[in-house]
């Protein structure tokens, strides 16, 4: 799918071999698609971590654990887009989360980072029912 999606085939190198227990970015090709649990085995550092709209689908303890592994990789910048107020709560008739994760949670969990900017209007989105899809930018503390 990925190879077929890019016109410049020469620039697309996809990691298609099985990686060892622990691995670094040097073991990866330009594009690597790994299951989320493999973040625990990744060694090294990154410049930018991006999460768009998936943290809001998880329970807070899962996000906190994931972020602990992201912080271990010491990205210089973090870019998040999620619902500021959190995902709707699950009910007997509606899907949702058991406990919402909000902007305050992200700021607390990314303890090695400082707030740069938050915006719903620039590149974010406010739904008709008042939920705010927020773009949040953090940078590593000196």
Annotate the PLM regions.
Residues 57-70:
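A short, conserved alpha-helix within the catalytic core of class I
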Residues 36-48, 97, 101-142:
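Rossmann-like AdoMet/SAM-dependent catalytic core
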Residues 43-44, 69-74:
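Short, conserved loop/helix-junction motifs that constitute active-site signature segments
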Residues 40-41, 57-59, 86-89, 124:
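Flexible loop/turn segments at secondary-structure boundaries
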Residues 74-87:
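Conserved beta-strand signature within the Rossmann-like core of class I S-adenosyl-L-methionine
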Residues 87-100:
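Short, flexible/disordered intra-domain loops and linkers
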Residues 2-42:
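S-adenosyl-L-methionine
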Residues 51-54:
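A short beta-strand submotif of the Rossmann-like class I SAM-dependent methyltransferase core
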